[in-house]
């Protein structure tokens, strides 16, 4: 049976999807959203970022989807990868930051978002 959301962060469409037996996860259907497509339109550099809060990590099915997307994008002009950004709480301002499982600080996060180093 399709897993119901445990939070209030879904859209009406997302809620509707979960109620449809014709596309239930037991039939093989899964869905996941992607949090950020981050781009510098002046340089053409771009990357994909999945944000997790409260120290959560992507579920196995999400990792599989994200790896599939990363492989499809690999080699595209300006593509700088698919990255997982985990906040200990809700943002860089209220706790630790993990980028691709490595702890960084807010300044390093800004460098990363400017495509100036980390993981790029």
State where each predicted segment sits.
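Catalytic cores of nucleic-acid endonucleases
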Residues: 29-31, 44, 53-104
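Domain-level recognition of nuclease-like catalytic cores that cleave nucleotide substrates
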Residues: 5-6, 11-18, 83-120
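Conserved catalytic cores of phosphodiester-cleaving nucleases, focusing on short active-site segments
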Residues: 36-38, 45-54
């Amino acid at each position: 049976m399709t897993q119901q959301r445990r939070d209030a962060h879904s859209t009406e469409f997302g809620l509707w999807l979960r109620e449809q037996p014709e596309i239930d996860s037991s039939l093989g259907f899964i869905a996941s959203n992607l949090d950020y497509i981050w781009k510098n339109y002046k340089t053409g550099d771009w990357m994909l970022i999945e944000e997790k809060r409260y120290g959560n990590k992507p579920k196995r099915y999400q990792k599989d989807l994200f790896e599939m997307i990363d492989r499809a994008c690999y080699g595209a002009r300006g593509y700088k990868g698919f990255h997982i950004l985990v906040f200990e709480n809700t943002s860089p301002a209220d706790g630790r930051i993990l980028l691709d499982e490595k702890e960084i600080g807010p300044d390093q996060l800004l460098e990363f978002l400017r495509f100036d180093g980390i993981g790029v």
